[in-house]
C-alpha cells in the first residue's frame, strides 16, 4: 500500500447505472500530506443529444449552469480515450497498480460508473476507498462543532473543482477531528476554515495529532 491517494470525481447525466452516461472525469493524486502532485487531468466526454435530452430537470439545470452541457456537445473524446488520459496521469505518480486507494466524496457512486465504463482504470486502483463523506457524517454525529465549522463548498458541480474541495475538506478534518482530546476550540476551528478558504495554509507535519490545539 502506497501513501498516495488517487482522487477522482465524475459528472454524469444521472445516477442510474442502467441508462445514464459518464460525461466528465477528473483526477488528482496527493501525497501523504495531501499535497497535489502534478497538474491533474480533467476530461469532458462526448454524449449524444438523446442522452442529454433524457436528463432530469435538476441535472439539466445544474449542468447547463456549469457550462458542462455545451462542452459535452463539443467534445470529441470517447470513454476509452478519457480512460487512457486519466491512467496516463495516475501512472506518472503511482507506478504500481493496486497500491493507491481511491479518494473522494460519496466515491462509491463514482467508482460504480468507473467499473462500468473504465475497467482498466478501476483495475489500477486499490480496492480500498477513502470517502470524505463518511468523515463528514461521523463529525455530524460526534463532533457537531467541527461539522458546522467546515469550509463552505462552492458546489460548482465540475469534476476538478469538486476534487479540490474534497481535498480541502479532508485537510480541515485532519486538523480539527484527527487530533487528541479535547480537540480544537470553536475559534481555532474557524481559523482553520478561514485559512483553507483563502488557500494560504497548506497541511504539514505540524498539523498532526502530536501537537493538538489547546482550548
Curated annotation (Swiss-Prot):
Record's GO cellular component terms: cytoplasm
UniProt xrefs under Gene3D superfamilies: Ribonuclease H-like superfamily/Ribonuclease H (3.30.420.10)
Keywords carried by this UniProt record: Cytoplasm, Exonuclease, Hydrolase, Nuclease
Enzyme Commission designation: 3.1.15.-
Active site: 127
GO molecular function, one term: 3'-5'-RNA exonuclease activity
Compositional bias segments (type: Low complexity): 202-215
Subcellular location: Cytoplasm
Disordered: annotated span: 196-215
Parts of the chain that traverse the membrane: none
Class of enzymatic activity (EC top level): hydrolase
Keyword Nuclease: yes
Keyword Cytoplasm attributed: yes
InterPro entries attached to this UniProt entry: Exonuclease_RNaseT/DNA_pol3, Oligoribonuclease, RNaseH-like_sf, RNaseH_sf
Highest taxon of source: Bacteria
Residue ranges of domain Exonuclease in the record: 5-170
PANTHER family on file: OLIGORIBONUCLEASE, MITOCHONDRIAL
Annotated family: Belongs to the oligoribonuclease family.
Function: 3'-to-5' exoribonuclease specific for small oligoribonucleotides.
Entry protein name: Oligoribonuclease
Native organism taxonomy: Bacteria, Bacillati, Actinomycetota, Actinomycetes, Mycobacteriales
The gene coding this protein: orn
Amino acid at each position: 500500500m502506497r501513501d498516495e491517494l488517487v482522487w477522482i470525481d465524475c459528472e454524469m447525466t444521472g445516477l442510474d447505472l442502467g441508462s445514464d452516461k459518464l460525461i466528465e472525469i477528473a483526477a488528482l493524486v496527493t501525497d501523504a500530506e495531501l499535497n497535489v502532485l502534478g497538474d491533474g487531468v480533467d476530461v469532458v466526454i462526448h454524449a449524444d443529444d438523446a442522452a442529454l435530452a433524457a436528463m432530469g430537470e435538476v441535472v439539466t439545470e445544474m449542468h447547463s449552469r456549469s457550462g458542462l452541457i455545451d462542452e459535452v456537445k463539443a467534445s470529441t473524446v470517447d470513454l476509452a480515450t478519457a480512460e487512457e488520459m486519466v491512467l496516463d496521469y495516475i501512472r506518472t505518480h503511482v507506478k504500481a497498480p493496486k497500491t493507491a486507494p481511491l479518494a473522494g466524496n460519496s466515491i462509491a457512486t463514482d467508482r460504480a460508473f468507473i467499473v462500468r465504463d473504465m475497467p482498466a482504470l478501476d483495475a489500477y486502483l486499490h480496492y480500498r476507498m477513502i470517502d470524505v463523506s463518511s468523515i463528514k457524517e461521523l463529525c455530524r454525529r460526534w463532533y457537531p462543532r467541527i461539522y458546522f465549522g467546515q469550509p463552505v463548498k462552492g458546489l460548482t458541480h465540475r469534476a476538478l473543482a469538486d476534487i479540490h474541495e474534497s481535498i480541502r475538506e479532508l485537510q480541515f478534518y485532519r486538523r480539527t477531528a484527527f487530533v487528541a482530546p479535547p480537540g480544537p476550540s470553536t475559534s481555532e476551528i474557524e481559523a482553520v476554515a478561514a485559512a483553507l478558504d483563502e488557500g494560504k495554509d497548506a497541511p504539514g507535519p505540524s498539523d498532526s495529532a502530536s501537537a493538538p490545539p489547546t482550548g
